[in-house]
């Protein structure tokens, strides 16, 4: 029969599945539901593949009368046992005749078939080898049985994947056609003999006996039809031929002579090994259930040669086949087209290709392993020739049983030193001989305290290279230095010292941890400075943050507030000594719980700080805390009447200090002491008072030698309102700010004679005095006069009465630079007129911030400086004044309207800012002076950019920006970083 290595993946899988059921010798009843396929591989790797090509599916019903006897002949040992498939003895001539019969059978499925007719028996001869030997060295016992057991499978997919019947598969002698009747009669006789023993064999097939028999040809031929014992008519050949035509038999045999010899050698070696093991006495087996001799021999054999020989490479065929399996892409595609092509030239499906590769991969490639023979030879030689060595080796391994965990315990390789060898366990077998050096597990625990006691010196020593013995510090133990010397002397020991390296790395980490713990016990300087009571607590009692539902508050902020709460609760306890007690533990626990509740409720950092401060105020009972809460209990911004300061007390340093503490001074809180003007909040009422008592002439200020006007102005150098060199020359003090684009100018009118030429002033003194007397002269705190009505006289030059009235009704709108240049022309005249225009705008600007002392003071100083410049340019001033008419001056009602209009916008802005940061003041995060300073600065900054606004609608669009600006000023006030801005 022609040999073709063709099979299917399904057949291979089924052979494994069914063989698992029959590996104990049990027979399995064949119940088929449709097409089937049988794959049988015997002991010599000969495969019999049977599949249906054109079978009759209508006759594939289940049958209970088809026996499946399998006889498994067991040898003395289960390891050497192999199953023999008993086949009927038929000569080669009968097989050839049957092949010829199959060739002549018709393929028409529509031919007459009788359901009651007997089935012809188609037999395929399995070549009987004289000495079948199983190669069992690469398979387990069950796998060996599975390999030799008949595999039966019922599947409906076989008809889809099976190939068409080829005449070459069943080719035989064409001249033996006269022997067909004889073959058929012999088949029928055999069938009748089999059916007579139906009942007994059927029961045997279900019993799990070890001596059951299987007729492989009944599996191959059986279709599950009912057998009729009374009808054995040989005349109905068409149905028999049709049924036989549905079977395709392939015998695949690949058993080279070298493999047969290797299998015989393997079997011989195994028998010798068993005999050597059986010579052991029973006492040794009782002492140890595992055979120590065999175990040591197998260990030595599996480990391979101890010399530096290169490992034996696998065979070239195995490597080539493996590459072929793993190779993908075009190369594999072209190869498979050539290798797995059909007879018609078409390529087989991937299913068939993979099936064939899997079949031969498991049967042929793995079977040719000379390493197995070498392993068995080495085991046998160790058992026979070296019994003493195995005993000594085993005796050296027995101490591991007393402490087995150390032989399996590996230290993590976290060291920074290079690794020259693989990691070793703590208790390596080779280190057991000299237990004094390496073997004791207690040495690790002894070495760690010694190294950790060195603290900082051990860190330095571990940082240096360990293999240099001369770089040992004083704190390093003598053990480590001696070990390092040994490492230098014996380079081979470097590979075995991973454990000591790991110990030193652990010691370094432990030393660092010890330093941290001592610092915690002593208390960090930050805790001592800010939280003295908390610093006295033991380190394990200090509060730690509880987990919150969200992370909207930074951890650093939470930790600070937790310390603050704990410190406050410890103060509340009034303990003489801070130690571990019920009171301290309760205070710490309360602080942790309170902080966690606040953190869960808070949606932002500001809210969190507010709630923490409220909680501290709520728990406060001491007198100092009550005194601190009292100014917060009332409204943070008291009524303007209670905040008014009379001019009589303005020079008193005690009053100034009180005003500064209350936040009513112009300077920010906590600023250094200096002579500061204390200005009332509402400038209009103070102006009314000073008009009655102030001097009539502006130049009478010379009679008051101590009078001075201080103020800080920030001018952008690139702004159009910057006065330039004239202002800088006349300034008494000029101080640069942090940024290069700003200049801080302090204006003074103490000695106007220094800055003015007396001859220039006397020239037009009468005209100037007359015009100034007609205006409303303001005095602030009895120190300075401010001309209020010079602007309309200057405006009369170009615009007339309508311009003044329009500006009065419009809320004090400031003219732009372009308008000023149109009205008054470029050059030096602009220095005269523009300050007067902006001085007129003071009616609106000053009224916008009556509650902010800093802003009003700034504007008044601005007006005073304008008056000084007016005196400088006095020659040109009368020309513009002479052109003005008294009727063009705005009335007091118009000025009142402008004041009220600007005042309302400023009040709205200020109220908006107060509403945002008032909770911080009430809760104690910032005090009153910081609160007032932040409100003043924020309002001043906002109104600087919205000075022309006619309504407060810009708060809708820019509310968030204003809030952020206010928060920045609050942070500046609380940190004290703003002091340098105000210090001189």
Curated annotation (Swiss-Prot):
Q: Low complexity composition bias: which ranges? A: 450-465
Q: Where is this region: Disordered?
A: 422-496, 622-697, 755-786
- Stretches with biased composition (Basic and acidic residues): 486-496, 641-651, 679-692
Highest taxon above the source species: Eukaryota
Residue spans with biased composition (Polar residues)?
A: 466-485
The regions listed as transmembrane in this protein's record are: none
Got any disulfides in this one, which pairs? none
Spell out the protein name for this chain: Uncharacterized protein At4g10930
Organism name: Arabidopsis thaliana
């Amino acid at each position: 029969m022609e040999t073709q290595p063709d099979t299917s993946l399904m057949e291979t899988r089924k052979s494994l599945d069914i063989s698992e059921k029959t590996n104990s010798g049990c027979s399995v009843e064949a119940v088929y539901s449709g097409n089937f396929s049988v794959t049988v591989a015997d002991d010599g790797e000969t495969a019999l593949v049977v599949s249906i090509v054109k079978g009759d599916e209508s006759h594939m019903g289940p049958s209970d009368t088809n026996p499946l006897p399998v006889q498994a002949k067991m040898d003395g040992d289960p390891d050497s046992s192999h199953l023999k498939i008993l086949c009927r003895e038929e000569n080669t001539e009968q097989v050839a005749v049957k092949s010829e019969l199959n060739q002549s059978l018709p393929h028409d499925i529509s031919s007459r078939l009788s359901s009651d007719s007997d089935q012809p028996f188609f037999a395929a001869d399995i070549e009987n080898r004289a000495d079948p030997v199983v190669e069992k060295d690469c398979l387990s016992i069950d796998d060996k049985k599975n390999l030799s057991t008949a595999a039966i499978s019922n599947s409906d997919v076989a008809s889809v994947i099976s190939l068409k019947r080829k005449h070459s598969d069943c080719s035989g002698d064409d001249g033996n056609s006269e022997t067909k009747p004889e073959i058929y009669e012999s088949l029928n006789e055999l069938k009748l003999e089999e059916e007579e023993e139906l009942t007994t064999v059927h029961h045997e097939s279900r019993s799990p006996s070890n001596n059951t028999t299987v007729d492989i040809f009944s599996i191959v031929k059986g279709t599950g039809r009912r057998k009729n014992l009374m009808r054995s008519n040989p005349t109905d050949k068409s149905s028999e031929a049709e049924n036989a035509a549905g079977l395709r038999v392939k015998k695949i045999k690949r058993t080279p002579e070298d493999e047969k010899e290797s299998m015989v050698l393997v079997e011989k070696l195994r028998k010798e090994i068993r005999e050597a093991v059986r010579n052991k006495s029973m006492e040794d087996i009782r002492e140890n259930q595992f055979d120590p001799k065999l175990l040591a021999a197998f260990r030595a054999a599996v480990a391979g040669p101890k010399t530096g020989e290169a490992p034996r490479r696998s065979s070239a065929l195995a490597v080539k086949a493996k590459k072929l399996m793993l190779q993908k892409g075009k190369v594999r595609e072209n190869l498979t087209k050539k290798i797995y092509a059909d007879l018609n030239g078409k390529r087989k499906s991937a299913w068939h290709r993979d099936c064939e590769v899997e079949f031969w991969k498991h049967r042929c490639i793995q079977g040719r392993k000379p390493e197995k023979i070498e392993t068995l030879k080495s085991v046998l030689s160790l058992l026979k020739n070296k019994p003493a060595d195995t005993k000594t080796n085993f005796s050296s391994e027995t101490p591991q049983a007393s402490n087995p965990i150390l032989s399996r315990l590996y230290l993590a390789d976290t060291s920074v030193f290079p690794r020259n060898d693989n990691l070793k366990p703590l208790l390596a077998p080779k280190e057991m001989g000299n237990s004094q050096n390496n073997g004791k597990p207690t040495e690790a625990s002894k070495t760690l305290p010694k190294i950790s006691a060195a603290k900082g010196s051990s860190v330095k020593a571990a940082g240096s290279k360990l293999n240099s013995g001369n770089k040992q510090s004083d704190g390093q133990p003598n053990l480590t230095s001696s070990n390092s010397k040994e490492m230098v002397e014996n380079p081979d020991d470097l590979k075995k010292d991973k454990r000591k390296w790991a110990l030193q790395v652990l010691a370094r980490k432990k030393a660092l941890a010890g330093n941290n713990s001592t610092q915690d016990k002593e208390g960090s300087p930050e805790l001592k400075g800010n939280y003295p009571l908390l610093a006295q607590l033991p380190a394990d009692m200090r509060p730690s943050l509880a987990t919150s539902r969200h992370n909207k508050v930074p951890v650093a902020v939470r930790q600070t507030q937790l310390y603050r709460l704990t410190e406050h609760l410890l103060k509340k306890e009034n303990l003489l000594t801070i130690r571990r007690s019920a009171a301290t533990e309760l205070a710490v626990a309360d602080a942790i719980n309170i902080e966690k509740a606040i953190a869960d409720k808070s949606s932002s950092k500001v809210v969190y700080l507010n709630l923490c401060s409220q909680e501290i105020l709520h728990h406060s009972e001491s007198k100092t805390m009550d005194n601190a809460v009292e100014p917060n209990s009332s409204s943070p911004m008291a009524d303007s009447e209670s905040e008014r300061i009379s001019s009589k007390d303005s020079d008193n340093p005690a009053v100034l200090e009180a005003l500064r503490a209350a936040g009513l001074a112009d300077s920010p809180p906590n600023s250094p002491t200096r002579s500061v003007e204390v200005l009332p909040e509402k400038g209009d009422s103070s102006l009314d008072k000073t008009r009655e008592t102030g001097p009539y002439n502006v130049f009478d200020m010379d009679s008051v030698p101590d009078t001075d006007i201080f103020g800080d102005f920030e001018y952008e150098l690139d702004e159009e309102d910057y006065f330039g060199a004239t202002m800088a020359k006349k300034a008494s003090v000029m101080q640069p700010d942090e940024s290069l684009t700003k200049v801080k100018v302090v204006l003074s009118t103490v000695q106007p004679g220094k800055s003015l030429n007396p001859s220039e002033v006397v020239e037009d003194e009468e005209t100037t005095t007359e015009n100034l007397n007609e205006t409303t002269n303001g005095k602030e705190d009895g120190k300075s006069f401010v001309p209020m009505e010079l602007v309309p006289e200057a405006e009369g030059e170009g615009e007339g009465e309508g311009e003044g009235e329009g500006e009065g009704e419009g809320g004090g709108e400031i003219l732009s630079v372009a308008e000023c240049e149109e009205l008054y022309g470029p050059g030096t005249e602009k220095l005269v007129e523009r300050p007067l225009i902006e001085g007129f705008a003071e009616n609106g600007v000053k009224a916008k911030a009556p509650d902010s002392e800093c802003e009003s003071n700034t504007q008044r100083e601005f007006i005073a400086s304008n008056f000084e410049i007016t005196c400088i340019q006095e020659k040109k001033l009368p020309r513009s004044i002479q052109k003005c008419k008294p009727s063009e001056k705005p009335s007091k009602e118009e000025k009142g309207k402008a004041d009220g209009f600007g005042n309302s916008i400023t009040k709205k802005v200020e109220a908006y800012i107060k509403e945002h940061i008032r909770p911080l003041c009430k809760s104690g995060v910032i005090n009153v002076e910081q609160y007032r300073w932040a409100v003043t600065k924020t309002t001043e900054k906002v109104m600087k950019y919205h000075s022309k606004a006619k309504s407060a609608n810009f708060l809708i669009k820019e509310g968030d920006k204003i809030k952020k600006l206010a928060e920045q000023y609050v942070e500046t006030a609380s940190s004290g970083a703003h002091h340098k801005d105000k210090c001189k």
